[in-house]
């Protein structure tokens, strides 16, 4: 089961990389057909002439949800952020804020997750599941259900903090910083921006605040072996800062920031840790993963999905010089991670037959 509430058009499908791996591993529907990326998911379905349909769990009763939890072997909530007005029919600047048309985790989602958890069906969730536009009460239910807590902070690496040279820099971040600090935006180098749900903004610039502006994902030796991932992996995309609230959860991987002395002070001012979870996992008595990053959002090319052994040529699949190339993360980290999770799910299903 794939849940994706952020499908703006056929070129912006957040679960693309999941379907790529399903195709590559030759996972099929019960009738033998491959999963259709444009149909086989729950969430937002864009149409023509600015029309759309929603196919989710909101009109389902308890029996319907119970049936779904029984039928599916694994659930992956790839993106619950949803669709904003400026991204959809208004065609305005996507780097500005706007009202939500559809999105956020819902009470029905929570009900389904509870049933999946009870049946020990593997659950994968990720970045912004607890963030806007998920209601506060639903966020609390999710946190209590899985023993974690979102701090309210999210952030990402920015290749250039110069507003003139980087048109993709979110201007609402710039305005919020100016209003909050009553000072001009003077940043020019690469760095990181952090935004809190209450409106606070923190900006860390290379040299002044950060020795290395790029967050690193660190995985210990045991989990490197379990998931076939490298010891360290750069991650220059959106992350959320989450706290583990249950000792039964395992921190599979951690984010490491590299602040200077001045950066340490700035992080402490906003209570932002320099080491925090990248992947949380629980295996007993239920199987759950939370990816504290926008992991599923990768621009994979489907023409390679049917080529057996293509992973052996992964060094040709991304630009080794461009540190912001999402394909690097897909081939080196995300793909082996998801392959390991899916294989474990498949083996567990076979053992129960």
Regions found by a protein language model. Name each.
Residues 88-100, 104-229:
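A glycine-rich, often tryptophan-bearing local segment used as a flexible ligand/cofactor-contacting loop or short
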Residues 31-114:
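Post-signal peptide N-terminal segment of secreted/secretory-pathway proteins
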Residues 26, 76-79, 120:
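Sec/Tat-exported extracytoplasmic proteins
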Residues 3-5, 72-92, 126-128, 290-298:
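Short loop/turn segments at strand-loop or loop-helix junctions that form parts
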